[in-house]
Amino acid sequence: MLMTICNRYTF
């Protein structure tokens, strides 16, 4: 789950 959130906030 953390990876998904981080990926979305990476932009």
Swiss-Prot record:
Top-level division of the source organism's lineage: Bacteria
Organism the protein comes from: Escherichia coli (strain K12)
Gene coding for it: ytiE
Induction: Identified when cells are grown in rich medium (at protein level).
Name listed for the protein in its UniProt record: Protein YtiE
